[in-house]
């Protein structure tokens, strides 16, 4: 993509000017259905922008790869612009580093090939000197798929290759929300608690979220009529280090 001459540097609302530049630079790009931009005018003459290329349905993987390469070069020249691409239900950030962008592209390919995945967002969230920080959010088609995808994202060499520097991973599906623990790791005990109850009783819904005190917290809703006390015992026995951070309630609505 060509970079057009810009007066961004002397714009009072720099974020607005950056967004305008992005739209102009990428306008008319083949296979791009829409361009979405956001602008952040932090202070006079200072700001940033995020630009997302929303690709046409059916855009080939080879074409996506080519556009990713062009976007990587673009953001390398425009450090106040965050470049993103949305293709096949997966939206992801493209960074200037070739290796990191290659990892994200590989994850995009595997997620789009996974029929358990409905959509996903892979976002770069650098903080101070820590540049390798990713936030990944995935929506799965059902609870079983959500847990399986979550596990696969942590399994080295399995279906989805993990990214380096993931800050938080969240996967949700109807009846389940699960995220990495407070130390950005695999919440083994939280998942064990959920699976222990699921193996014995029908589960209406569950939330396995990060918790600053225990690392993870578990909330499980079992079907009405289930022996809740037994379900609590099952869950807490499977996750002894979480203690009262594991809760089980009954679905009173049936």
Question: What residues fall within each predicted segment?
Answer:
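Long, acidic/polar, low-complexity amphipathic helices and coiled-coil-like
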Residues: 48-50, 65, 75-176
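N-terminal Sec/ER secretory leader and immediately downstream segment
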Residues: 18, 22-92
């Amino acid at each position: 993509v060509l970079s057009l001459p810009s007066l961004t540097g002397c714009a009072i609302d720099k974020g607005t000017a950056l967004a305008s530049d992005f739209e102009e630079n990428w306008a008319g790009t083949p296979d791009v259905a829409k361009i979405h931009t956001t602008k952040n005018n932090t202070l006079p003459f200072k700001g940033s922008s995020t630009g997302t290329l929303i690709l046409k349905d059916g855009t080939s993987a080879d074409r996506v790869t080519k556009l990713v390469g062009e976007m990587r070069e673009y953001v390398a020249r425009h450090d106040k612009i965050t470049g993103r691409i949305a293709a096949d239900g997966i939206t992801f950030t493209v960074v200037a580093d070739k290796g990191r962008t290659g990892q994200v592209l590989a994850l995009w390919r595997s997620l789009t090939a996974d029929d358990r995945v409905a959509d996903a967002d892979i976002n770069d969230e650098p903080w101070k000197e820590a540049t390798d920080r990713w936030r990944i959010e995935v929506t799965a088609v059902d609870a079983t798929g959500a847990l399986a995808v979550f596990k696969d994202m942590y399994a080295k060499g399995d279906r989805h290759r993990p990214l380096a520097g993931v800050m938080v991973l969240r996967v949700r599906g109807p009846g389940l929300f699960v995220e990495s623990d407070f130390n950005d790791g695999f919440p083994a005990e939280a998942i064990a608690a959920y699976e222990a109850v699921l193996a014995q009783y029908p589960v209406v819904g569950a939330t396995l979220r990060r918790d600053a005190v225990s690392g993870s917290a578990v909330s499980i809703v079992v079907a009405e009529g289930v022996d809740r006390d037994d379900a609590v015992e099952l869950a807490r026995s499977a996750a002894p280090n979480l203690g009262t951070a594991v809760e089980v309630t009954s679905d009173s609505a049936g």
